[in-house]
Amino acid sequence: MKTTYVNATIVTMNEQNEVIENGYIIVENDKIIDVNSGEFASDFEVDEVIDMKGKWVLPGLVNTHTHVVMSLLRGIGDDMLLQPWLETRIWPLESQFTPQIAVASTELGLLEMVKSGTTSFSDMFNPIGVDQDAIMETVSRSGMRAAVSRTLFSFGTKEDEKKAIEEAEKYVKRYYNESGMLTTMVAPHSPYTCSTELLEECARIAVENQTMVHIHLSETEREVRDIEAQYGKRPVEYAASCGLFKRSTVIAHGVVLNDNERAFLAEHDVRVAHNPNSNLKLGSGIANVKAMLEAGIKVGIATDSVASNNNLDMFEEMRIATLLQKGIHQDATALPVETALTLATKGAAEVIGMKQTGSLEVGKCADFITIDPSNKPHLQPADEVLSHLVYAASGKDISDVIINGKRVVWNGECKTLDEERIIFEASRYKRGLQR
């Protein structure tokens, strides 16, 4: 099946950050086979031609760190620091989850993400009360591209920890698929919730199965103080001593890093998922993304969960990310629009090991989203496309979402998820949780 999308303004995110006016994209099954400008007069025979009527077409956004199973917990822990937020709000409520609640919560997060332009994401879920196979089936049904990882903790007894490791290893062996629509990573929660033995076992699983690692690290000053007091090392050095960086690793946050740590992370191919809104809301601080990029670290933008954000709008994250860097460095050139877009598309895809997506180029997967600026005053005059995408647009502006060549959202309607049912069930299940 070959489909041509014509009469579009195409934000390619290729090496030149080329924007093609009056362009077209040809998709064969799940791949892009041509991207060009001008009237469509290709040598390719196509089955369908779709007039985009001047819409902006850009790569699907890539969310490098989130927790969709927590989507029912939106708004339950506002105005709290990380540790009390986790200990008095999040973990007690997650302990009440059932497989049905977890699926309903996941569906809500998936629906929000895909309708706001996210096509790929990396996720960590707490396995308590969760049917992991049902979660993976739900993500698959959404049509999204994802790395969904089972989180490990050292809560309970040593026997509980051993069982958690065994279950996580089985999960990795079952779901790791580097080039598929769904894959996974090894995901110890953090150095303050995992024992040294558990972190070492996670490193072993990652090496033996050739997977990536995903962990919260260097998120707060308190974490750094506590880990240094307990182990005599800061979190980066401690994680490295446990062997976690033997495989490509994504650290969520990296708010509290010094120059030596940034150089070390770059040398060991440790990538950072940058969560600006969540870090601000939890009072964790502001990550120095400018310094990370200058050190050579791969960085991708992320939302974290709705419980700490409180939405999954990657356009908002792009805008906040670039404004924060300009503000803390008192440098208006810090994190320009092209870089911000890269950190939410091609660069983010590289961070989570999904190089097959993130830009609109021949050979890449057909993952793209559209915005119709014609009826949106906040996107006018419409000729400054890149600026508007970062500084003016929002997830509410999305018209269409194509993932792997399939129309997942079309004219604002999600084709893979039942929006009315999901919203109804989310409210019903939320009322059953006891604070």
Curated annotation (Swiss-Prot):
Catalytic activity annotation: S-adenosyl-L-homocysteine + H2O + H(+) = S-inosyl-L-homocysteine + NH4(+); S-methyl-5'-thioadenosine + H2O + H(+) = S-methyl-5'-thioinosine + NH4(+)
Q: SUPFAM superfamilies under this entry? A: Composite domain of metallo-dependent hydrolases (SSF51338), Metallo-dependent hydrolases (SSF51556)
Q: Which GO terms describe its molecular function?
A: 5'-methylthioadenosine deaminase activity; metal ion binding; S-adenosylhomocysteine deaminase activity
Annotated cofactor note: Binds 1 zinc ion per subunit.
The residues forming the signal peptide are none
Q: What is its EC number?
A: 3.5.4.28, 3.5.4.31
Tell me where the transmembrane regions lie.
none
Among CDD domains, the record links this protein to:
ATZ_TRZ_like
Family membership: Belongs to the metallo-dependent hydrolases superfamily. MTA/SAH deaminase family.
Q: What is this protein called?
A: 5-methylthioadenosine/S-adenosylhomocysteine deaminase
Q: What does UniProt list as this organism's lineage? A: Bacteria, Bacillati, Bacillota, Bacilli, Bacillales
Give me the gene this protein comes from.
mtaD
